[in-house]
Amino acid sequence: MDRVLKFRYFLVALLLWNCGETPKQQKTEDTPTTKTEETNSVATETEETDDAVILFFGNSLTAAYGLDTEEGFPNQIQLKIDSLGLNYTVINSGLSGETTAGGRNRLDWVLNQEVDIFVLELGANDGLRGIPLTETRANLQAMIDLVREKNPETRIVLAGMQIPPNMGMEYTTEFRNIYPELAKANDVALIPFLLEGVAGVPELNLEDGIHPTADGQKIVANTVWQVLKPILK
């Protein structure tokens, strides 16, 4: 199947700043002190396919903020899948600015389709905004529970995240530990740190210092692939 057809964007939504710039011009929505407005732009392609579905559910990191969507790591995963002749279709459900609470609210609608592998990438915006970690943990757990309620056979991959120590070391450490603890408690696959080898490397991030460049996205894709590939049948 043609790569463009296989890479269906179930939901591409961009968080626009007050000045209404395009994604490549705007500041990062992940800055907790900046008020934002959320504008959803929905694009769906409904071509029939017998392929199994891998759904990436996340925030601007998944949505490839500041880049063309083809440069994002979900599309890089699709390219790897296609190169091996595997019958999987990647769906990118990344929403810029998304918190775990927002993800929890929209997940039920996203799961109206059959999903074989669900990759959960949320929490970074919670951490940057200092949201109570009890809420972050509860929301992530609720999303895992909902995926299993919808389809117990869906395999889940949890993408671990880390944040700078702006909120203090206790908060930062507890935030980092949420992901391995939830992965162990729920017996789901864990990507230890989604931005391994990218975070803190200026040349691999946009000017905001948060979102990966195209080269950074390729490294993220390799990090994800190390965990995802063994799951694919």
Give the location of each predicted region.
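Sec-dependent bacterial lipoprotein signal peptides
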Residues: 1-17
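Short histidine/acidic/glycine/proline-rich micro-motifs that form metal-
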Residues: 61-64, 68, 94-98, 125-127, ...
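N-terminal helical cap/lid subdomain that shapes the substrate entry/recognition surface
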Residues: 101
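Conserved Rossmann-like nucleotide-binding pocket used by diverse enzymes
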Residues: 15, 91, 157
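Alpha-helical cap/lid subdomain in secreted, periplasmic
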Residues: 104-233
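Serine-esterase "nucleophile elbow" of acetyl-processing enzymes
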Residues: 30-96, 106-114
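Bacterial signal peptide processing site
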Residues: 19-23
